[in-house]
């Protein structure tokens, strides 16, 4: 079975369920599966870079922001900012009387990036982050997860049919297949980022 579009995904889910009374629920199953994929998947295809000028304590994150990978100030030599908790950032502000300076720390506060010290000028910053997985719809018919890992999409949706399939033995199988798919996605990303299998040939010298 080939699954490359939103419509084909819905059709495959319907075939697996084999329940005419659940056809209207399939889009909901897909949406719930997408929410789970967002929590479980961290892949290099999600990685993005955003550059901005920071001159205030708070900066907005990109619209598709999911999670920080790295955050740097690139003005006057590139320097990474250290991620700390909101509590620790507040404590540092209190101990330093909220003094301004070159930003060295950041926290995610109310959906924004909060830096400390508060910038004493305008600095260029680069944010490397994981972007959200785009939702499928009748107009947005595919995304990178469906293109490269359709099995994960399929089983994530099938899992969420559970309330309608009481004591159906297939649910355990679908859950296991979903987890196996997630493991493969994340392992694929890790393998690419470390440069292959990690195996190296040892040459003997004479």
Can you annotate each of these PLM segments?
Residues 1-206:
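Glycine-enriched, solvent-exposed interface loops adjoining structured elements
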């Amino acid at each position: 079975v080939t699954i490359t579009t939103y419509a084909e995904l819905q059709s495959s889910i319907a075939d697996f369920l084999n329940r005419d009374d659940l056809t209207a629920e399939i889009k909901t199953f897909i949406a719930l599966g997408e929410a789970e994929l967002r929590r479980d998947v961290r892949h290099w295809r999600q990685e993005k870079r955003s550059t901005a000028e920071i001159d205030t304590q708070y900066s907005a994150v990109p619209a598709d922001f999911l999670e920080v990978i790295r955050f740097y100030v690139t003005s006057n030599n590139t320097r990474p900012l250290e991620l700390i908790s909101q509590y620790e950032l507040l404590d540092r502000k209190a101990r330093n009387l909220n003094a301004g300076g070159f930003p060295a720390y950041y926290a995610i506060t109310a959906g924004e990036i909060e830096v400390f010290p508060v910038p004493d000028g305008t600095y260029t910053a680069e944010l490397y982050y994981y972007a959200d997985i785009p939702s499928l719809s009748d107009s947005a018919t595919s995304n990178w997860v469906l293109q490269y890992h359709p099995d994960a999409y399929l089983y994530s949706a099938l899992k969420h049919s559970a309330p309608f399939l009481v004591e159906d033995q297939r649910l355990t199988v679908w859950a296991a297949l979903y987890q196996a798919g997630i493991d493969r996605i994340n392992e694929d990303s890790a393998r690419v980022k470390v440069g292959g299998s990690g195996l190296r040939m040892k040459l003997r010298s004479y």
